[in-house]
């Protein structure tokens, strides 16, 4: 039966989900009292993209093997992924009552409390986690947030965890589901400024390479930077990028020599970076004279703070503040294009803006 599960896992990874789940069913029928087979079957269904089946087996597993914490944790993770945090929380609480101080359980409880908007509970779990992991940047971030402080940037782990999970379906999810046009708008803005296609581009937070896809071939190099290895793997398949660096946006800018690129693009990335103070001056330094920095932001209202952390855990920026920062850093010819629909969020249009800033030809 274990062999059936192993084969099922292999088939699931090869995108043969139906056959994989059938094998898992056979294994479960043949070994109904084996908790390891149950865990394997749940994993097969999960890897096959059959979430409902995975949850059904996990719920059955919790009934059959109530003492096996691993099955209950697996169920809780599945429920969180299906946006059922209240249901997940109940299972995390059971595990916590039996095994206090378990890191994954505490992280799960914190996540559920944040998702359900229960800030008192979130602060409590963040306190427990910080006592357990005092040097963990992600824990420090959530602890600050749940205690009423707004961190001015997010630790890289926040972004990596989001986008590694997203990678294979990212283009489809964004372009079709969220009416996401930013990479095309950035590509159009670049081609309007470089009609001969002669430029080198640093694409910060390149994701699956949509800016490159919309640009097509250029007479120069496109260098992609992203924290998510899985995103980079997807982007590489287009055959448009010259090379990639797996590093965060701030480090990429800091480590790039001065006067190096004709253009820098940044599509839907600064919403995760937050504070632009370390971004804008370095972008100016890295650009060649006459080069362009093109990026998108979610809009914070003019009656709001310059930087606002939304419940989505993305930062919104005030357009007038961004324009001021660009000009103060030394950019000229700054254009802000307001976009009524940057993307869709919970079936509602989310406003944003595209900023295009040129480095002066002479210092």
Predicted regions span which residues?
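A short glycine-rich, Lys/Arg-flanked "PGG" loop and its adjoining helix->strand segment in the class I
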Residues: 277-289
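A short acidic, Gly/Pro-enriched loop at the edge of an enzyme's catalytic core
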Residues: 254-264
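Short, glycine-/aromatic-enriched active-site segment of Class I SAM-dependent methyltransferases
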Residues: 295-314
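Short alpha-helix
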Residues: 314-330
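Canonical tetratricopeptide repeat
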Residues: 6, 40, 74, 108-109, ...
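Class I SAM-dependent methyltransferase SAM/SAH-binding core
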Residues: 202, 208-253
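N-terminal auxiliary segments of SAM/dcSAM-dependent transferases
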Residues: 108-160
């Amino acid at each position: 039966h274990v062999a059936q599960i192993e084969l099922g896992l292999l088939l699931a990874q090869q995108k043969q989900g139906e056959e994989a789940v059938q094998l898992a069913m056979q294994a479960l029928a043949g070994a109904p009292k084996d908790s390891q087979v149950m865990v394997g079957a749940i994993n097969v269904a999960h890897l096959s993209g059959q979430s409902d089946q995975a949850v059904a087996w996990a719920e059955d597993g919790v009934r059959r093997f109530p003492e096996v914490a691993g099955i209950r944790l697996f169920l809780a993770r599945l429920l969180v992924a299906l946006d059922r945090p209240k249901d997940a929380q109940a299972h995390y609480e059971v595990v916590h009552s039996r095994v206090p101080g378990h890191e994954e359980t505490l992280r799960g409880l914190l996540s559920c409390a944040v998702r359900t908007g229960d800030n008192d509970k979130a602060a409590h779990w963040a306190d427990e986690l910080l006592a357990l992991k005092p040097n963990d940047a992600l824990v420090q971030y959530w602890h600050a947030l749940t205690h009423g402080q707004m961190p001015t940037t997010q630790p890289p782990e926040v972004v990596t965890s989001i986008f590694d999970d997203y990678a294979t379906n990212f283009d489809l999810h964004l372009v079709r589901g969220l009416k996401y046009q930013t990479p095309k708008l950035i590509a159009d803005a670049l081609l309007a400024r470089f009609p001969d296609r002669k430029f080198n581009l640093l694409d910060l937070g390149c994701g699956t390479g949509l800016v490159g896809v919309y640009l097509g071939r250029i007479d120069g190099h496109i260098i992609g930077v992203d924290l998510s290895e899985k995103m980079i793997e997807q982007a590489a398949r287009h055959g448009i990028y010259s090379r990639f660096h797996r590093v965060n946006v701030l480090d990429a800018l800091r480590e790039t020599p001065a006067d190096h690129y004709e253009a820098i693009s940044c599509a839907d990335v600064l919403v995760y970076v937050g504070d632009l103070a370390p971004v804008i001056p370095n972008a100016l330094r890295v650009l060649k004279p006459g080069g362009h920095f093109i990026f998108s932001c979610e809009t914070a209202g003019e009656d709001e703070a310059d930087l606002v952390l939304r419940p989505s855990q993305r930062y919104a920026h005030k357009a007038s503040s961004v324009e001021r920062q660009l000009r103060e850093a030394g950019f000229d010819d700054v254009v802000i294009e307001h976009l009524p629909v940057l993307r869709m969020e919970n079936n509602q249009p989310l406003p944003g803006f595209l900023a295009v800033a040129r480095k002066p030809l002479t210092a």
